[in-house]
């Protein structure tokens, strides 16, 4: 059985079409879609909130994630500018590890570990 750690935040933009995308802290208790490729992030959005509604964010454990490129099982994952996942490159933040692989535009299983920046 996989355990997840969730945070309850407030969506600071309409996120109805952003479920399973990668998000980050925007302001006090608020989140927005991640906009800086390879930068540090908070976690993966687990629901579909409108602006001002409760947003559930998975910050640790196994979750679904939306791929912005082909993902290979076992690869470390970072974020694209559009909040999707891609394989990490040197100097980028490693959100976690892909447990399954998939094609771009599909969902895969991501183990969120917050591994820091890749050297």
Segment roles from a protein language model:
Residues 1-119:
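Surface-exposed, low-hydrophobicity beta-strand/loop segments enriched in small/polar/acidic residues
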């Amino acid at each position: 059985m996989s355990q997840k750690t969730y945070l309850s935040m407030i969506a600071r933009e309409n996120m109805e079409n952003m479920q399973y995308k990668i998000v980050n802290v925007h302001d006090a208790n608020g989140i927005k879609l991640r906009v800086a490729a390879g930068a540090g992030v908070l976690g993966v959005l687990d629901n579909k909130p409108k602006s001002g509604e409760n947003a559930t964010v998975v910050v640790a454990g196994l979750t679904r994630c939306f791929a912005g490129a082909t993902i290979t099982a076992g690869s470390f994952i970072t974020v694209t500018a559009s909040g999707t996942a891609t394989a990490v490159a040197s100097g980028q933040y490693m959100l976690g590890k892909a447990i399954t692989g998939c094609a771009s535009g599909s969902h895969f299983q991501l183990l969120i570990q917050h591994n820091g920046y890749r050297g």
